[in-house]
């Protein structure tokens, strides 16, 4: 491949911090696997470490705001104007941005941007199952919101002032998804206890 950007749209022809975070999460897992390997494996781990250190998370604050933005374009700048707030699949982006050894963001970016100073907290029930967080644009959210941030990050024991247990929250979000498919209020063909899992396939139309 050429290494050039393949834009999703006219103005989405530059950096994408969310997808970068997903990629980096996987690469860091590879780094940990190979770091003590043979010479080729150590060389691969070193290349990954350099990529990790090169990601400029701080740039995506769009002028030192206490929030991270999804897109930046070399031709359109910040015109897509998409600051990211929780909760959704993007938590890993804020965690990696805070953890960066070279371009780390201050804690206020997580608290003000992601958690919106506590507005992310909204205890409620969906399908009779307890959830603790407010999900963007929906009561619960699709299954990938429970998955993507934890492909390389273990949620067991993970908590903060906004959520007493990210493991239990994501488990319950998964159970909500399953319960909805079993109830199948819109009578979709095939939905049931053996056919469930609405991940990146949902839409505003149901």
Predicted segments with their positions:
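Ser/Thr/Asn(+Pro)-rich, low-complexity disordered segments
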Residues: 1-206
């Amino acid at each position: 491949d050429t290494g050039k950007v393949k834009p999703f749209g006219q103005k989405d022809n530059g950096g994408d911090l969310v997808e970068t975070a997903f990629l980096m999460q996987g690469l860091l897992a590879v780094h940990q696997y190979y770091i003590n390997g043979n010479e080729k494996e150590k060389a691969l781990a070193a290349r990954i470490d350099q990529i990790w250190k090169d990601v400029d998370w701080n740039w995506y604050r769009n002028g030192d705001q206490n929030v991270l933005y999804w897109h930046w374009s070399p031709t359109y700048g910040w015109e897509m104007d998409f600051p990211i707030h929780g909760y959704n699949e993007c938590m890993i982006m804020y965690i990696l941005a805070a953890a960066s050894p070279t371009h780390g963001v201050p804690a206020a970016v997580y608290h003000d941007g992601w958690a919106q100073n506590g507005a992310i907290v909204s205890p409620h029930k969906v399908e009779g199952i307890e959830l603790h967080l407010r999900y963007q644009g929906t009561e619960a959210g699709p299954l990938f919101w429970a998955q993507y941030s934890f492909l390389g990050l273990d949620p067991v024991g993970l908590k903060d002032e906004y959520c007493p247990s990210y493991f239990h929250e994501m488990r319950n979000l998964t159970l909500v998804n399953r319960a909805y498919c079993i109830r199948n209020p819109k009578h979709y063909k095939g939905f049931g206890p053996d056919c469930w899992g609405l991940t990146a396939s949902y839409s505003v139309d149901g």
